[in-house]
Amino acid sequence: MRYRAVVEYDGTAFIGWQRQKGVAGRSVQESIEDAIYRLSQQCVTVFAAGRTDAGVHALGQVVHFDLNTSLQDYVIKNALNHYLRSDMVSILSLEEAAEGFHARFSAKKRHYMYKIVNRDAPPCLDRLRMWHVPKQLNVSDMQEAASHMVGEKKDFASFRAKECQSKSSVRTVDRIDCVREGNNIFVHVSAKSFLHKQVRIIVGTLVQCGHGAFPPSYVLEILERKNRAAAGITAPPHGLYLVLVEY
C-alpha cells in the first residue's frame, strides 16, 4: 500500500532532506525511514516533494512510501509521531495515496516562504528560524525587483548554485511577494519546480536590492547575463520554509 503524508520539521539539526553518502549527520529522510522501521520492521524508502537543504525547515512537506500493513492510517501516524518525538519531525496527516501518486513527480506547484527579521537587535528566540538583516530594507524596491523574475519560462542560470545538476535553467515562477509585518519581512515564492538554491539566491538578491546595493531594474541584467556571479548573495538556509505542495 502506498501512503501519502504531510510532514513538518525543524531543519536546524539535519543535513537536509536526503540521505547523503559520506556526509556526517542525520537527514530528515533517514529519521522517517527509521521510524517506519521501528513500527513495521520493514525497510522502506521515503520520497519527498522537496529535497530541502541543511537548515531549511518545512511546514508542509509531502512524502510518500510503500508499506505492507493492516494498521489503520491514524495508528500509523500516531506511532510514527511517537518514534519521531525527539527528532523535531511531525507527521501532520497520513492517508492512503491514489494509484500512481508520487510526492515529487506528481506535484503541480511548490510554495516557499522566507522569513527575515529587519531590525537592529538580533532575534533571540527564533535566531535559527529567520534571517537577521539589521540594515533597513525598502520592501517596495524588493517587490519591484521581484516582478522582473515572475512569468513564463525565464532563464534563471544566474540564480542557481554551481553544483545544480538540472539540465535546464529555465523555470516559470508564478509568484514572488514581499510583505512587511512590523519588523518581519516575508518573501513568498511559488513555482512548479526550482533550481538548487534558487529561492535563497532570489531572496539574497532582493535583500541587496532592498538596502540599495543596486536598483530593481538591475534584475533584468542579472537574468540576461546567465552567470551566478551576476546575482546577489545566497540567503542563509535557516530562514527558508517549504510551506505547501499542490497536486
UniProtKB/Swiss-Prot annotation:
Signal peptide: none
EC main group: isomerase
EC number: 5.4.99.12
Top-rank lineage group of the source organism: Bacteria
Keyword tRNA processing: yes
Annotated catalytic residues: D53 (nucleophile)
Keyword field contains Zinc-finger: no
GO function term, MF aspect, one: tRNA pseudouridine(38-40) synthase activity
Pfam families associated with the record: PseudoU_synth_1
Family, per entry: Belongs to the tRNA pseudouridine synthase TruA family.
Function according to Swiss-Prot or TrEMBL: Formation of pseudouridine at positions 38, 39 and 40 in the anticodon stem and loop of transfer RNAs.
Quaternary context: Homodimer.
Protein known as: tRNA pseudouridine synthase A
Source organism of the structure: Anaplasma marginale (strain St. Maries)
Gene giving rise to this polypeptide: truA
